[in-house]
Amino acid sequence: MELLMCSGQAESGGSSSTESSSLSGGLRFGQKIYFEDGSGSRSKNRVNTVRKSSTTARCQVEGCRMDLSNVKAYYSRHKVCCIHSKSSKVIVSGLHQRFCQQCSRFHQLSEFDLEKRSCRRRLACHNERRRKPQPTTALFTSHYSRIAPSLYGNPNAAMIKSVLGDPTAWSTARSVMQRPGPWQINPVRETHPHMNVLSHGSSSFTTCPEMINNNSTDSSCALSLLSNSYPIHQQQLQTPTNTWRPSSGFDSMISFSDKVTMAQPPPISTHQPPISTHQQYLSQTWEVIAGEKSNSHYMSPVSQISEPADFQISNGTTMGGFELYLHQQVLKQYMEPENTRAYDSSPQHFNWSL
């Protein structure tokens, strides 16, 4: 019995030692112990190294096989070295090809144009995007371009028209300003040798009727100071007139039913200042001859302040001192530089300025 017990203890001690040794060499899950195989681990390391060597990027051009592990990611991704990516012709898979920088792959030589580094299809798309009009350019276009420059034969006429206006409007306004007036001043030549007949075509007399028409009320006020026969003056304005002639003399006066005459005042008395020769010449008699088709507003400014019939002086008749003084003041007003007519003593030139 003792021998059996000793042998059992020896067996149990041996089994425990083996279990401890087995536990030290592997893992025990339940009744199964998994041991690590040293040869298996070595084989796995070899497989990993083979895989790493097989995945190393190399240039796919025949005869190059350059390692691309230490170059830029672009070249290692597309498996082409820097030199062959810019070459005009390489051999890949037994064909003459070229690397396209837009597609990032090799194409046949027929797909390229001359020395272009991109294929024809990608260049067409690129040029189409660049030539497409930008929407912001329409904001900077000027509205002057809408006017056709060919209207005036000048490429800059559109800008000139928009800034200065239509040139045709200026020409139309100018033609209206140069239009001859419907009235005429014709002094008689035999009255004075230095006076010439004036034509009605001068453009300087064009605005006279408008000035007379606008100042008709002022002349009536001035007439009311000279005489009390204001209704007679209104009747004179209603008579049609279009011709002016000086009388045959400075002291004589011709009065008819269809004429209105303003005579020269009588000789100045000694207590009043004398009138200069120029003033006496400008105060000569003017006759207003009635016309057929003209209106009363075409009369000269002098005629509108002419004296009425009862204020005319001829053949030595005299007027009152106060009335004579007013008559002289009116004559001085029209003999100022801006109202008088410039006169030249030469018989060839006679300048009238309003």
UniProtKB/Swiss-Prot annotation:
Q: What induces it?
A: Negatively regulated by microRNAs miR157.
- The entry marks the following residues as binding Zn(2+) 1, namely C59, C64, C81, H84
Q: What Pfam families does this protein's entry cite?
A: SBP
Q: Where does Zn(2+) 2 bind?
A: C100, C103, H107, C119
Q: Where is this motif: Bipartite nuclear localization signal?
A: 116-132
Which stretches of sequence are listed as region Disordered?
1-25
Kindly state what the record says about how the cofactor is bound: Binds 2 Zn(2+) ions per subunit.
Question: Where does the protein principally reside?
Answer: nucleus
Annotated domain remarks? The SBP-type zinc finger is required for the binding to DNA.
Stated role: Trans-acting factor that binds specifically to the consensus nucleotide sequence 5'-TNCGTACAA-3'.
Q: What is this protein called?
A: Squamosa promoter-binding-like protein 15
Origin organism is: Arabidopsis thaliana
